[in-house]
């Protein structure tokens, strides 16, 4: 009996696939890439047609030895790495590292790790797609050239430890440009007017908004203008001029792409893109489900396609019919394909088995796995469901020369909202509106003028930044999360209450990049380069020609930057904590585990201290300050500033409220307070003044 070897990236994926194949199949993981460019040098021979100098990655010797041993025993080798550019490149590197040119081998791909998909991929085995490999090589070489040649300039001109990149530098520029828009924004005053009108037979007054006069809509820019209108309306009769009832359909959403999954997980679950991708990877590669073994729960997570297979569409609609009724089954919203942005080889992100509803496997998943899986499940089911139907009623009201409008919206049919109510939509307005007749006289109860000011553009969040990058065609599904992770890790931006704020360091880097490398941080140029990479994938352009056309101007820019750019001094954040060894005020520095305090007298004085943030709550055990800390793995917890003398520690934020049953301190859980004593278990609502309490951000050391 012939023996087959299947090589995948991860042990989890190997474990899931193994159960689908017979005893004559061995499945081994390469643990990601086995060859790459060297870290210590550029690794690209500029003079020799930009030839990459690949080396075996340090630490991969044992893995390759095991793989070579398995290859010798196998009659055929299947390279089953992920179905994208990166996966194709890993297979290509394995081909060379394992010397498969004289071996019977094939490349297989699947968008979901199911028995049907894996076995079908073996039936449709193929050669390595060199267009995909070359697209990955072009990206890798471009990114290496940009990063390795600009980063040392930033080290020399600003400070060490900085980096630049084709996508990360554009992302930083977008955030800086938005910050500038916000800073330059000048609020404009405007007013609105609402009339509260009594309707015969209704206890609740009708709320009608001023929309204009007989001829046109009007804008009110000052209190004087508003007072003129109020004076005119005194004593005027309010009469119903027309009632209009219309039906509106709200289409079901498209299933998730990588971008939209990251956006929704950020806004709904408060997951950073990096966390979303990590958990989605677990769901894709396989989770142990009782009675089923290791199961891949979702399709491939790096995709910009909203396409759904015929089989998955039919299975979802059958599930919807049984669970909700035939009237809830929809046609399924069809996406408009944009060739500039969509690589449509994959499906959208969806569940693999309709039998594994979130509720049925909740106990088998971690909390985060369940929440993300439920989000994916609900979105996919919603995409196959009927539209929601609204009954909209609009009442036009005349008051002399002015016109008011009252409206109500009633959900007539939930449709997809029954599983995926994005904005918690519900019926709004006075539902009695449609029963009001034309020419009905209404009694004025009150006129309520309100002053407003136009608002500046919103700060970017991780979700809105991902959306913008995708809209501009910058980066690909695999790059959004690491891009945001990099600019936050470099301290170019900080995240506060979901908003991304540029730091002084980020501004300095962005200004230098705009001055010396304008094209690198130009949105349109970066999008054009992405388009060229797509053309390489399609076999329309040779990958080295992309580099050849890019490099000459870039080389000149690097040479000019080295000569002409002046040094920029970034001042450290000085604290009121005094160094107990030399008496200087300590400054905030950043390390692998976040902030710490360091003496500015380095290297003469090497004193450092942990940096904590006060949360404005006295320690329940000793009365000292409770401070927010982090474990070495980055998990946040609350401790006492007097540690180690005081051993107080809590994973949840403690409250100043004492338990009314046992006197122990309470801890915050959502909008509730829970007694810290497990024996007590008392729960109560959080006092209003305790909600949304901000940390002071003061430096504390011990």
Task: Locate predicted features.
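Intrinsically disordered, low-complexity regulatory segments
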Residues: 1-140, 149, 212, 220-223, ...
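Basic, low-complexity terminal or inter-domain segments flanking catalytic cores
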Residues: 2-4, 16, 25, 151, ...
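Alpha-helical scaffold elements adjacent to nucleotide-binding pockets in ATP/GTP-utilizing enzyme cores
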Residues: 16-20, 66, 89-97, 117-121, ...
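Conserved short loop/turn motifs at secondary-structure junctions
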Residues: 82-83, 159-163, 245-254, 264-269, ...
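C-terminal or mid-to-C-terminal helical accessory/interaction module adjacent to the motor/catalytic core
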Residues: 113, 117-195, 246
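Core structural elements
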Residues: 139-149, 167, 197-199, 248-260, ...
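Metal- or metallocofactor-binding catalytic centers and their adjacent structured scaffolds
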Residues: 216-254, 440
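Short helix-coil junctions and helix-kink-helix linkers
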Residues: 260-272, 466-476
């Amino acid at each position: 009996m012939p023996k087959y070897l299947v090589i995948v990236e991860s042990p989890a994926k190997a474990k899931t696939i193994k159960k689908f194949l017979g005893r004559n199949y061995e499945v081994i993981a390469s643990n990601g890439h086995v060859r790459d460019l060297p870290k210590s040098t550029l690794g690209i021979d500029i003079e020799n047609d930009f030839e990459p100098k690949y080396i075996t990655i340090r630490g991969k010797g044992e893995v390759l030895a095991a793989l070579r041993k398995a290859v010798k025993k196998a009659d055929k080798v299947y390279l089953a790495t992920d179905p994208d550019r990166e996966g194709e490149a890993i297979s290509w590197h394995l081909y060379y590292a394992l010397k498969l040119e004289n071996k019977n081998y094939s490349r297989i791909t699947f968008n979901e790790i199911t028995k049907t998909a894996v076995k079908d991929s073996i039936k449709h085995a193929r050669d390595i797609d060199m267009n995909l490999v070359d697209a990955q090589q072009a990206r890798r070489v471009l990114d290496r050239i940009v990063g390795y040649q600009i980063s040392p300039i930033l080290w020399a001109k600003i400070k060490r430890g900085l980096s630049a990149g084709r996508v990360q530098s554009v992302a930083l520029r977008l955030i800086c440009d938005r910050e500038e828009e916000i800073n330059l924004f000048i609020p404009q005053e405007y007013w609105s007017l609402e009339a509260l009108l009594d309707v015969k037979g209704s206890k609740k007054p009708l709320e009608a908004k001023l929309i204009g006069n007989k001829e046109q809509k009007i804008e009110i820019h000052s209190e004087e203008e508003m007072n003129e209108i109020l004076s005119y309306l005194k004593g005027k009769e309010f009469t119903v001029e027309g009632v209009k009832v219309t039906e509106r359909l709200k289409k079901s959403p498209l299933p998730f792409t990588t971008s939209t999954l990251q956006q929704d997980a950020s806004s709904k679950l408060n997951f950073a893109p990096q966390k979303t991708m990590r958990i989605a990877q677990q769901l894709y590669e396989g989770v142990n489900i009782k009675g089923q073994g290791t199961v891949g729960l979702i399709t491939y997570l790096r995709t910009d396609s909203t396409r759904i297979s015929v089989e998955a569409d039919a299975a979802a609609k059958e599930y919807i019919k049984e669970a909700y009724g035939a009237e809830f089954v929809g046609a399924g919203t069809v996406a408009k394909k944009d060739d500039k942005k969509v690589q449509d080889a994959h499906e959208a992100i969806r569940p693999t088995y309709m039998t594994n509803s979130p509720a049925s496997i909740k106990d088998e998943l971690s909390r985060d796995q369940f929440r993300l899986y439920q989000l994916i499940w609900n979105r996919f089911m919603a995409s196959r469901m009927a539209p929601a139907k609204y009954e909209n009623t609009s009442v036009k009201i005349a008051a002399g020369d002015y016109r008011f409008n009252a409206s109500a919206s009633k959900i007539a049919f939930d449709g997809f909202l029954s599983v995926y109510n994005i904005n918690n939509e519900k019926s709004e307005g006075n539902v009695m509106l449609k029963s009001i007749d034309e020419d009905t006289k209404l009694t004025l109860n009150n006129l309520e003028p309100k002053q407003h000011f136009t608002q500046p553009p919103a700060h970017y969040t991780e979700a809105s930044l991902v959306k913008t990058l995708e809209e501009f065609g910058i980066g690909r599904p695999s790059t959004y999360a690491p891009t945001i992770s990099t600019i936050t890790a470099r301290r170019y931006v900080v995240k506060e209450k979901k908003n991304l704020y540029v730091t002084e360091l980020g501004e300095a880097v962005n200004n230098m990049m705009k001055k010396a490398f304008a094209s690198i941080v130009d949105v349109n140029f970066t999008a054009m380069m992405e388009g060229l990479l797509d053309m390489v994938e399609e076999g329309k352009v040779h990958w080295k020609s992309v580099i050849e056309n890019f490099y000459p101007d870039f080389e000149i820019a690097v040479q000019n930057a080295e000569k002409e750019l002046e040094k920029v001094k970034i001042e450290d954040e000085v604290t009121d904590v005094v160094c107990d060894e030399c008496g200087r005020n300590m400054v905030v520095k950043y390390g692998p585990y976040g902030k710490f305090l360091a003496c500015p007298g380095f290297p003469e004085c090497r004193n450092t201290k942990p940096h904590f943030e006060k949360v404005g709550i006295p320690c329940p055990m000793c009365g000292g300050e409770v401070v927010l800390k982090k474990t070495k793995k980055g998990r946040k917890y609350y401790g006492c500033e007097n540690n180690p003398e005081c051993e107080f520690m809590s994973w949840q934020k403690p409250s100043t409220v004492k338990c009314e049953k046992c006197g122990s301190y309470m801890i915050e859980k959502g909008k509730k307070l829970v007694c810290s004593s497990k024996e007590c278990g008392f729960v109560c609502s959080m006092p209003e003044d305790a909600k949304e309490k901000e940390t002071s951000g003061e430096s504390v050391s011990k």
